[in-house]
Amino acid sequence: ADWQRAASDAFADYLARDVAPIVGAHERERRLPPRELVRAMSGYGLLGGLLPEALGGQGLDHVTYGTLLAQLAGTWASLRSMISTSNLVLSIIAERGSAEQRERFLPALMRGDTLAFFGLTEPNVGSDASGVETRAERDPASGGWRLRGRKLYISNGVHADLGVVFARTGSGADHAVSAFIVERGMAGFSAREVYAMGMHCCPLGELLFDDVLLPAANLIGAEGQAFAIAKHYLNLGRCFVAYVCAGVSEAAYKEACRYAGQRQQFGRPIGQFQLVQQMVADMMTRVESSRLLAARAADALDRKSADAQRWC
């Protein structure tokens, strides 16, 4: 649609003007993206844009959101990781949280004033939501919960202001997993950076929960019902990861084309050799295939198709 093209073009102009020039220096120095860039993402719909207007969102469809996310990923993958992780968490709070939780946490998250992490992955079970070993037990004295365990490879984990943590609240044989909002500064909660090869400006974190006392009000939804939450939002996340991969691949393809046009060999640009042309054509084919597959998954989500999970 025309409005989608206009939104994409405006975002592309912004990325080229205000984001692309600073990426190299920030990645080399491992500096977090400036907070004003994070806040700017809100205006383009990347923080809460999928939510209905009644919840403060823009009611974007998944195809449009994915297209914008791919553009951001192709420009600065670290900023994309920071934004999409925070958006995932604010979506959970908006759609599954209580009115009190929405009122307390959503406005700042949607403005980009605060950032969030998604605390699922663990050392021994990966992202298997049914097998999490982190536990939360009721605290009779406070009426809240005591959280104990460890999460690993968590995007935004080192610098986020809050996050959603999945913890077992039932026996090991069932899927009684619950979701809790954990805030930075809570006693017993600590985080450290985990080295990663790429995306240096959005470091991964190891999160430790040493008898963290959580208020009862920080439980999202009903006790023991978070397995379905994790499953739903992981499907959503996979769709957008496909867009991200397409965006990064397209950026690499464009760089390859630029290089092939500049690099001289035997008196002419290497892009004039048939072998290089074939390689570039194969790249373009794969980039377009990945983009179309991502769009197919997003369209299935928009149509609420029964086979959406298969495409995601």
What is each PLM-predicted segment?
Residues 1-75, 96-101, 108-112, 139-141, ...:
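Alpha-helical interface subdomain recognition
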Residues 60-62, 128-130, 156-161, 174-176, ...:
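Short glycine/proline-enriched turns and hinge-like loops at secondary-structure junctions
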Residues 80-100, 126, 138:
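N-terminal glycine-rich flavin-associated loop
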Residues 112-121:
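A short, Trp-centered hydrophobic/proline-enriched beta-strand micro-motif
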Residues 125-126, 152-158, 236-240:
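Glycine-rich phosphate/pyrophosphate-binding beta-alpha loops
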Residues 131-133, 185-215:
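Flexible, small-/acidic-enriched active-site or ligand-binding loops
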Residues 144-192:
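A short core secondary-structure module
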Residues 205-232:
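A short, charged helix-loop
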